[in-house]
């Protein structure tokens, strides 16, 4: 009986496509390769997003990862733009807080062109498209590999008989929408939780969703140091832990967060509401001081227990708009982390 129910769930979900997942999403927000970092940051803030595709004239650039993702005229098919990479908030922050961390030079750094920093963080080189007819299960497969977002053509110019549903590096379309890991989980929460009752009632530990390797910064790590170590470790967010027992130099690097008390979270997206004059004064602060200043109070840490259900984990990431949940034991000490990638990977493996 359970096996039949599983098959029924699978068949319902397989009829959902990437096009369905993006139906309510707005048209693509992007910046030209000549845009300044200041302009790009303002665009990120104005649209409440953490990443932007970067567009350039065709024929002059190699796309991220060798991709050839083009925007073409709907009537003539003439290529107008080539998307050459993704710019993230972490790219901008890492550029500001790099080795040359003379904060008085912030205006000069923010006047740099976005094309000069694409790829400084690895995520900027990850540029993919998903065919609109790709099933939600195939989308989950892609996102379970750590790909955070993909472009979905509104109308593809690639010949339909050559088009295969799935992830692509070559595409031409008159317009695109962005599909993210969060979009997929929000869609499942809003429309398909009933189909997934069995798996959602299982614990995150039972499903193997908890990653027990969790790096952290301490209450004495500055914003500037935090950004640099996050860039090096390809992390968009880290827990801030209480660590009075460690050596002074360890406050400058990532530490093992397990079995420590979490007192905050520092995320690259926390800085997207900062104006440039504020950035200049906030980079030398500790990350903990910064998070308290930006929110006006001590922020609640988004966490769950080791035995929390998958449904509870998804509810937390979607309703709170975060990309990971810290996993605590009964004493409130850090045991691990569950990211959007972990959630999607666990769900996908149960629907095989």
Curated annotation (Swiss-Prot):
Expressed highly in rosette leaves, cauline leaves, open flowers, developing siliques and dry seeds, but at a low level in stems and floral buds. Belongs to the 5'-AMP-activated protein kinase gamma subunit family. This is SNF1-related protein kinase regulatory subunit gamma-like PV42a. InterPro entries: AMPK_gamma/SDS23_families (IPR050511), CBS_dom (IPR000644), CBS_dom_sf (IPR046342). Residues 24-106, 122-196, 210-281, 297-352 form the CBS domain. The keyword Repeat applies. Keywords: CBS domain, Repeat. Gene3D superfamilies: CBS-domain. Plays redundant role with PV42b in regulating male gametogenesis and pollen tube guidance. GO terms for biological process: developmental process involved in reproduction; embryo sac development; pollen development; pollen tube guidance; stamen development. Disruption phenotype: Shorter siliques and reduced seed sets in pv42a and pv42b RNAi double mutant. It holds the Pfam family CBS. It comes from Arabidopsis thaliana (Mouse-ear cress).
